[in-house]
């Protein structure tokens, strides 16, 4: 099931310049998801990171992993319109390859555990089949107040 940017924006609240998933390529509800982010030099982080050698910040790769997981949660639950998804913990984040403008990040997340409103994930970012980043993280789903 392909999910385009319009539906992604219906599923998660992020917007430019902080929307870091362009398309979902595969989704297996309650299990895993694969999406992409096309990295372009026009993104605001590259004006300062770094002006003469643009490099995608590691924290934004982690954020992209969290966003793809939030899309998986929203689709698995049927909707998160009346809920907020909060990142609770990031574990073992590792960065293994530079990501730069022109690259396409393939962002994969797997649900490791889900208990009531707490979800645990393993996630990776690859570029051209090469591991760029990996992390485990925990998120909480709460009713909007």
From Swiss-Prot:
Assigned protein family: Belongs to the thioester dehydratase family. FabZ subfamily.
Record keywords, A-Z: Cytoplasm, Lipid A biosynthesis, Lipid biosynthesis, Lipid metabolism, Lyase
Predominant location category: cytoplasm
Name of the protein: 3-hydroxyacyl-[acyl-carrier-protein] dehydratase FabZ
InterPro entries: FabA_FabZ, FabZ, HotDog_dom_sf
Lipid metabolism found in the keyword field: yes
Gene Ontology cellular-component annotations: cytoplasm; membrane
Gene: fabZ
Enzyme active site: 49
Transmembrane portions of the chain: none
Organism of derivation: Rickettsia akari (strain Hartford)
